[in-house]
């Protein structure tokens, strides 16, 4: 089915982005005029998790630098208020207690702040135990520094261990096909787990997005099933799975797929699965446009047997489709002919002759 040459009567779906969800599952929705104030910043953890790595590294580096600079200013202020900037630290006055040895400039204060935060050990600069303000500031910097390091370490671990990263190994076919199964037309797509570790409790759902005449997007649920599994979820996902949606007269796709140039729509497919090792739920998404649904096609065979009898998956055939040749329907029901027996013009009895075979 090719809808690239047809006019699309959906202004919202036909602008810069022809799809609401990209093939790799990212949303193209843009929130214009949304207020991103304190309410948005309250979810700082979620903001960090959604950041790209380069921005996350920049934020963390800036956090450390700002932390060092703030306490460098405070250490410099302590030295200035204590009168440590004008005296000779090697030969201090007898009645003067130096708070931090050899802090005579802002550069020295920044260096001391860096040494305190990284706990690399004091050299010529060290705080005096007889200066209460220096001891208090040292405790505050150490406490806040440990909190900052714990937060950054946790953010790194959480971002690396996100279930979203496991979902990248789930792959959908680029195209969906409409083929016959058990004599009924079905919309079919395939999904593969490209990692050897299995997924469990696999669930698939789909939503059909259409634009109404009033400009609103209408959502319709589309049900998919997996072969003969009666439950809503597949308990084990290690080899490619094929999902079917039977196109009946009540199906929301029935009228859309009857035309050679259908109106624009988007079918978004969601797959949720549980990681066997961690028990976390990961989700993978994709979408199909009318131009990505092939009529009268089926997918090429994926499963083969190896030399030792083991199953093998030919992933090079994962996105391949082949034309579906319609098979003539042969009726095996006998053809019956009613015959009447007449004697002397009167009907005596009647019987049937069953003729089997093909009729022209």
Curated annotation (Swiss-Prot):
One annotated GO molecular function is: inward rectifier potassium channel activity
Keyword annotations from UniProtKB, A to Z? Cell membrane, Ion channel, Ion transport, Membrane, Phosphoprotein, Potassium, Potassium transport, Transmembrane, Transmembrane helix, Transport, Voltage-gated channel
Keyword Cell membrane carried by entry: yes
Q: What InterPro entries would the database entry show?
A: Ig_E-set, IRK_C, K_chnl_inward-rec_Kir, K_chnl_inward-rec_Kir_cyto, KCNJ13, Kir_TM
> Which GO cellular component terms are attached?
monoatomic ion channel complex; plasma membrane
Q: How is it modified after translation?
A: Phosphorylation at Ser-201 by PKC strongly inhibits ionic currents, while phosphorylation at Ser-287 by PKA increases them.
What topology does it adopt in the membrane?
Multi-pass membrane protein
Chain positions found as Phosphoserine: 201, 287
> Cytoplasmic face: residue ranges?
1-50, 158-360
Main subcellular location of this protein, as a coarse class: membrane
- A GO BP annotation: regulation of monoatomic ion transmembrane transport
**Catalyses which reaction(s):** K(+)(in) = K(+)(out)
The lineage's top-level taxon is Eukaryota
Q: Where is this motif: Selectivity filter?
A: 119-124
Q: Where in the cell is it found?
A: Membrane; Cell membrane
Q: Does the keyword Transmembrane apply?
A: yes
Intramembrane annotation, residue ranges: 106-122
Give the record's family classification.
Belongs to the inward rectifier-type potassium channel (TC 1.A.2.1) family. KCNJ13 subfamily.
Q: How does it assemble?
A: Homotetramer. Interacts with RAB28; the interaction may facilitate cone outer segments phagocytosis.
Record-given protein name: Inward rectifier potassium channel 13
Which organism was this protein described from?
A: Rattus norvegicus
What gene is this protein a product of?
Answer: Kcnj13
